[in-house]
């Protein structure tokens, strides 16, 4: 098997090698260049270790910096970012890039401050499980014609968006001192015809021109949607529209959320794919599985054990390295929240994604394991120019082990990526590995792989000007060139390690500090240093000056290499080494003091190797800690945690309740509502009745809609109503104030119909009112039939049964429609419930004395609606990060639509009859961790059985003493209630 694969790969390498030019710069800038090996920034090769981050899903700019610091600390040097058109444009011609979390300049500034690059992805179409795939909702009603083509109507709508956002991206390119290094065109757009006049080709050329007009000069990129086609590569049928850097999206896990035994099947054909599709370009995975989304009725993310497993990161991400990938973006690295009505119907409120960084911004073990790879790629410069020697099962003494073999042609460095051939295997296997080194062919003995484990074995690996490994069976975590060369290796507890220094023929003396016993054995190619990994940290000081840290995996998870530079490209002499705490955000060295900013849940050991004997004092979050110097030069002490903090979220006892569906009453004054009087729609989806009742045709897009249809006569026996508001969405109807039916919603139905029966006793001779209230779970993405993002929302058709016609229809949605009356929270935060329109969810609103003293636990007895409000105060310590959430519960069988508002932000859409989510976290800035908070809950029943909750409780997640500034005034993000809301009754 090895011979066949090696011959094939050598043939591909020969063909590619004769077609390659190096250091391509596309004529626009030399700050970012590329060749078939890697991207280069400012003349230095870069392993792009990136994570996907969507600022829309975290509407607190200060928390972006929190996330970026955590990513930087855990080995990432870049983020990939979607810019959603719909988040910034409430109406045609209007763009908001300044208000609150719409201020994307702050995104770029924080990225630069944290020391991470940005890959910009502005669409115009994004997908991303966000409503309408990121399109502006005002445009997603059919007026764009044939979307994602060269259609003139479509071009006229998206061009202003790309120009406006493109100018801001351009101003933040690396050429202008900013962090942007790549700019993506469109998203997963499959090239279906290699013809220059094809509409997709013309469309991609249009995008390129508009981005260029906006001033973009960094290389362009695109992301192929899996191995289904080859699209927009200059190396494959380039007839126009091709980008500079071709990329392939891959979500290969095939995992079951609740069955860890299923799936876990590696893809081992990436290298061949890229050699065929983009042989002059570096291998780029713009979206590689960092988790997976869950649908309505699916699973809670915290129960997805397989996706959350650090084993996934270990095996899959190292397999990518073995495939010679040098640009990798983890989708998602932090998912965040589909707050407001930002979700597409395929997902619920949480967008946790089982990502390495939890929705609550807490670090999962998966991120800790990912860090081991990120820190390794950061210092392993020889990895950035390798040839594929071969792959297969012939490199080891056990045919159950699969090997990727990479070699750097300039330095002879080798990287052997090992995993079980059957990647889902749970077997523990011990074997020897045959490698090629500068000292000749060598068999490295006693390598052990646990089940679902991967290792990168290095040979001829330089870790200092005069320090190198001939080989090591332990994995390299990182190294530092300080006063001495410091090498950091890791293994699982109980695994055997063996390493040999290059060009060190004589046996070195050494001293060991820790629980791991190291012995030396002279061989024909140098002295072997042999050990079995014990728990904890062991330091070994060699007589050649090298200091080696030997870590077990759990200790490696808490090992950091914080940079002393803000440059995303960190040289081995531009970081120090810290072991022990939960998080190290940053370090500075001032004279004799090393100042560390970090977080800790519990008090931990703290070991700092700064490489400078003048450094005698360690400060943790501004306070000096007691420390001592070890015999090998580090400083050790204790970093305080939060175990002493008493966290008791207040109970929610004092509620006010008001009717949030007064508009179901026949005498309700709807004279200021929007009249539905259109007889034709720009939407291509056929009408089921007249007038047009598509909510988007009247400027109401997100959230609940309320319709009131009038008719005369007592002979009507019912109505046939069809509604489309996304899967899982329900609706209910009232005739002259009395409930007459509806649909509770289902996870497999976006369009629902019901025949409503009218009791003749409810009818009047004139002016009967049928009120229909519809829930909303988002606009569809492009792939959903029949028309994707244009699939209309609201009532598709309504006809009377038994004779007669509706004489009029009126609609009410979010207050102001497209006017965007709350620009801070934006156009997709609210819907059309009366309480929302009146602003009862906003801070500063005071319920009148007439409001009932009732809570969601009391609920409602029939098909009604209530809006509940209360306030509470949090007094967390100023240096504490304590994510807070709201736990809801409802009696079995409850069918209702529940929304949660925290300080005006809709941060929970709870459907107890569908699920799965019942716990809703709030980030600092949405919730005031040191101040008063306004909590509102809207609830309306989908049946005449009524609805109530049986649990409404604030809960704390973890608690962390932090050096981040959580003691902030979030008032600018929480505009107060104003009495002008009354005009939207």
Swiss-Prot record:
Residue positions with a glycan: 276, 391, 434, 517, 602, 677, 715, 720, 759
Provide this UniProt record's keywords sorted from A to Z: Carbohydrate metabolism, Disulfide bond, Glycoprotein, Glycosidase, Hydrolase, Polysaccharide degradation, Secreted, Signal
Q: Where is the active site?
A: 188 (proton donor), 287 (nucleophile)
Renumbered to this chain, the signal peptide range is 1-23
- Cellular localization per UniProt: Secreted
Q: Name one GO biological process term.
A: polysaccharide catabolic process
Give yes or no: UniProt keyword Protease: no
| Record EC number | 3.2.1.23
The kind of enzyme this is, by top-level EC class, is: hydrolase
Task: Offer a single GO CC term for the protein.
Answer: extracellular region
Keyword field contains Disulfide bond: yes
Spell out the reaction equation it catalyses: Hydrolysis of terminal non-reducing beta-D-galactose residues in beta-D-galactosides
Q: Which residues bind substrate?
A: 82, 127-129, 187, 251, 353
The record lists its disulfide bonds as 257-304
Q: Which GO terms describe its molecular function?
A: beta-galactosidase activity
Predominantly, its location class is secreted
UniProt similarity note: Belongs to the glycosyl hydrolase 35 family.
Q: What does this protein do?
A: Cleaves beta-linked terminal galactosyl residues from gangliosides, glycoproteins, and glycosaminoglycans.
What is the protein's given name?
Answer: Probable beta-galactosidase C
User: Which species is this UniProt entry from?
Assistant: Aspergillus clavatus (strain ATCC 1007 / CBS 513.65 / DSM 816 / NCTC 3887 / NRRL 1 / QM 1276 / 107)
């Amino acid at each position: 098997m090895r011979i066949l694969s090696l011959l094939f790969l050598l043939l591909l390498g020969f063909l590619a090698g004769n077609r390659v030019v190096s250091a391509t710069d596309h004529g626009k800038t030399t700050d970012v260049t590329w060749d078939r090996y890697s991207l280069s920034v400012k003349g230095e090769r870069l392993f792009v270790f990136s994570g996907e981050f969507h600022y829309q899903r975290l509407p607190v700019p200060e928390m972006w910096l929190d996330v970026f610091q955590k990513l930087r600390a855990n080995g990432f040097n870049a983020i990939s970012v979607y810019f959603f058109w719909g988040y910034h444009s409430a109406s045609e011609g209007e763009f908001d890039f300044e208000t609150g979390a719409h201020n994307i300049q702050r995104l770029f500034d924080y990225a630069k401050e944290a020391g991470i690059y940005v890959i910009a992805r502005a669409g115009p179409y994004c997908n991303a499980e966000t409503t309408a795939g990121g399109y502006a909702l005002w445009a997603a009603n059919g007026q764009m014609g044939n979307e994602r083509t060269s259609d003139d109507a479509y071009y006229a709508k998206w061009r202003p968006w790309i120009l406006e956002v493109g100018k801001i991206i351009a101003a933040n390119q690396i050429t202008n001192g900013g962090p942007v290094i790549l700019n993506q065109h469109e998203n997963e757009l499959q090239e279906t015809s290699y013809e220059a006049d094809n509409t997709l080709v013309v469309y991609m050329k249009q995008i390129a021109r508009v981005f260029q007009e906006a001033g973009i000069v960094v290389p362009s990129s695109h992301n192929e949607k899996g191995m289904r086609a080859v699209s927009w590569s200059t190396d494959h049928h380039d007839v126009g529209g091709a980008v500079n850097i071709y990329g392939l999206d891959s979500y290969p896990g095939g995992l079951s959320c609740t069955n860890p035994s299923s799936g876990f099947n590696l893809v081992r054909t990436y290298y061949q794919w890229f050699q065929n599709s983009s042989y002059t370009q570096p291998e780029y995975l713009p979206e590689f599985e960092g988790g997976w989304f869950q649908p309505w009725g699916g699973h809670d993310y915290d129960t997805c054990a397989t996706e959350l497993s650090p084993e996934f990161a270990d095996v899959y991400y190292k397999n990518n390295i073995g495939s010679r990938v040098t640009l990798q973006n983890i989708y998602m690295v932090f998912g965040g929240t589909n707050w407001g009505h930002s979700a597409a119907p395929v997902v619920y409120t949480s967008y946790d994604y089982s990502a390495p960084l939890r929705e609550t911004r807490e670090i999962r073990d998966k991120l800790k394991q990912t860090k081991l790879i990120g820190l390794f790629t950061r210092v392993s410069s020889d990895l950035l120019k390798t040839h594929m020697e071969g792959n297969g099962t012939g490199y080891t003494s056990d045919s159950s082990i699969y090997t990727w073999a990479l070699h750097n042609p300039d330095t002879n460095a080798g990287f052997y990526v090992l995993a079980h051939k059957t990647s889902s295997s749970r077997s523990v296997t011990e074997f020897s590995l045959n490698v090629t080194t500068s000292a000749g062919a060598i068999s490295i003995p006693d390598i052990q792989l646990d089940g679902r484990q991967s290792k990168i074995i290095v040979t001829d690996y330089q870790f200092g000007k005069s320090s190198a490994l001939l080989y090591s069976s332990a994995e390299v975590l990182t190294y530092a060139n300080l006063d001495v060369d410091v090498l950091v290796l890791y293994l699982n507890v109980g695994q055997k390690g063996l390493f040999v220094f290059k060009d060190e023929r004589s046996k070195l003396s050494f001293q060991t500090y820790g629980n791991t016993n190291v012995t030396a054995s002279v061989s024909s190619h140098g002295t072997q240093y042999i050990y079995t990994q014990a728990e904890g940290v062991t330091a070994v000081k060699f007589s050649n000056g090298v200091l080696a840290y030997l870590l077990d995996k759990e200790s490696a998870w808490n090992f950091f290499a914080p940079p002393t530079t803000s440059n995303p490209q960190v040289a081995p002499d531009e970081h120090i080494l810290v072991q022990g705490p939960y998080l190290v955000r940053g370090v500075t060295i001032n004279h004799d003091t090393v100042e560390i900013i970090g977080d800790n849940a519990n008090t931990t050991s703290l070991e700092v190797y700064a490489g400078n004997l003048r450094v005698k004092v360690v400060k943790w979050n501004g306070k000096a800690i007691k420390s001592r110097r070890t015999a090998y030069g580090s400083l050790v002490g204790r970093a305080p945690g939060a175990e002493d903090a008493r966290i008791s979220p207040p109970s929610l006892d004092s509620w006010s309740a008001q009717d949030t569906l007064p508009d179901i009453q026949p005498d309700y004054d709807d004279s200021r509502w929007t009249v539905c009087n259109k007889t034709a729609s720009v939407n291509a989806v056929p009408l089921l009745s007249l007038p047009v009742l598509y909510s988007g045709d009247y400027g109401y897009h997100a959230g609940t809609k309320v319709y009131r249809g009038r008719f005369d006569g007592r002979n009507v026996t019912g109505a046939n109503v069809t509604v489309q508001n996304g899967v899982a969405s329900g609706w209910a109807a009232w005739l002259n104030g009395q409930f007459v039916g509806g649909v509770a919603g289902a996870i497999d139905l976006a369009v629902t119909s019901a025949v409503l029966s009218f009791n003749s006793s409810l009818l009047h001779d004139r002016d009967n009112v049928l009120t229909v209230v519809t829930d909303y779970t988002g606009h569809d993405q492009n792939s959903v039939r029949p028309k994707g993002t244009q699939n209309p929302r609201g009532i598709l058709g309504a006809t009377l049964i038994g004779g007669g016609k509706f004489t009029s229809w009126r609609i009410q949605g979010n207050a102001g429609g497209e006017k965007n009356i709350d620009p801070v929270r934006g156009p997709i935060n609210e819907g059309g419930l009366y309480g929302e329109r009146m602003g009862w969810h906003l801070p500063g609103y005071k319920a009148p004395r007439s409001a009932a003293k009732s809570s969601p636990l009391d609920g409602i007895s029939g098909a009604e609606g209530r809006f509940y409000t209360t306030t509470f105060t949090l007094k967390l310590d100023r240096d504490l990060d304590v994510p807070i959430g709201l736990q809801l519960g409802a009696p079995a069988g409850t069918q209702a639509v529940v929304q949660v508002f925290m300080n005006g932000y809709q941060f929970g859409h709870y459907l107890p009859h569908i699920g799965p989510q019942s716990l809703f976290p709030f980030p600092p800035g949405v919730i005031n961790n040191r101040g008063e908070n306004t909590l509102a809950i809207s609830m309306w029943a989908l049946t005449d059985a009524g609805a109530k909750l049986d649990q409404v409780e604030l809960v704390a997640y973890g608690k962390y003493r932090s050096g981040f500034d959580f003691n902030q005034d979030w008032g600018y993000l929480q505009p107060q209630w104003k009495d002008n809301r009354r005009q939207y009754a």
